Structures are given as C-alpha cells and as structure tokens.
Curated annotation (Swiss-Prot):
GO terms for molecular function: mRNA 5'-diphosphatase activity. Belongs to the Nudix hydrolase family. RppH subfamily. Pfam families: NUDIX (PF00293). SUPFAM superfamilies: Nudix. Signal peptide: none annotated. It comes from the Bacteria. This is RNA pyrophosphohydrolase. Residues 6-149 form the Nudix hydrolase domain. One of its GO terms (biological process) is mRNA catabolic process. HAMAP family: Nudix_RppH.
Amino acid sequence: MIDFDGYRPNVGIVICNRKGQVLWAKRCGQNSWQFPQGGINDNESAEQAMYRELHEEVGLQPKDVRLLYVSKHWLRYKLPKRLLRYDSKPMCIGQKQRWFLLQLVSDEKNINMQTTKSPEFDGWRWVSFWYPVRQVVSFKRDVYRKVMKEFASILFTDNPLIFSTSREANSQHYSANKKYSQTKYTKRHFYKSRGQ
C-alpha cells in the first residue's frame, strides 16, 4: 500500500529495557543495524501492524511488552535514488512511519529473530538510548533523531518507571538464540557498524 505522495505506511518499534537501553537489531547477512520496522497491510491499523511485526521480526507477543507511547505524527524519510524501484507501479519513494515505544516486561530469552522463513534480522543487542541516532544509515537519521527526542521526554521525565540514563552500552551481544562470541565480535566492531 503506497499513498498518493509515494510513501509506504510503516511502523517503527523501539523496545527498551528497565535500564533505558534500546534493542538494536542486525540485518540478516549484513553489517548494518536498525530498529525493527515494517509495512502496514490493507485493513490493518498501525497498532495491529506493530504487534504483527513485533512477532515476525523479534519473536515477542503482546504479553511480553508494555506499550508506553505512540509518536504523535507520521514521520517520513525518502529513499536514496539507488534504492528506488523505477519499474514498480506505483513507485515508492520512501516510508511514512508511526513509531511505538515498548518496554520489555518478560525475559529477554523470549527474543527470537528466527520466527519466519525469511527473517529480517540475525542478531541483536542492547545499546544506550541515543546510540542509534549516530549509527543508523544517513537517510533515516533525521527520523531517528526526531522519534528518539520525542520518546526521551516520555522515558526520562514523564514516565513513572525509573530508568537509568547511562550512556554506557551493554557489552553483551546476542544472536537470535545464542550469545555472540566477544572474541569474534568486539565492542569496536559494533561501534563501527551502521544500521540500514
């Protein structure tokens, strides 16, 4: 489904833990990282799409998370010309996204990136709250900056839940079902990576 302006309606998902860190996911077979996201199907609300994508991409059920906040506005980004599919009709020039802030309330062992035959991600880790803004691919950076600024006002001021504002990233790195070897994937490796 693409709107009249050429944007595909989409949901973005930020999952935080009780330390205020956020789940950062590694795209399959790539050294690029991003938040979970996905398109909204016909006759599907943004919230329904979010829970579907949450299960498909992260393996979590509604009972595993608490919905803390939904972005007030749709946020848009344009795809770079090299990613446009000029032969598709109608042509999609970018995404318009409604963002959801969730808190993980179940055990993180329930996170499983391998729930579908064609998974989007093959690994994940917890990172400090602002880390994704600096690391995501450049054409998504403005959207990430806006959504994280909006979510920060909820997590760190208005929300009664207590979060640490530490900018220190968790040093544990996870695959879909097992921990990444720290000898193979060093902290330097992760900090140099870029999301897509």
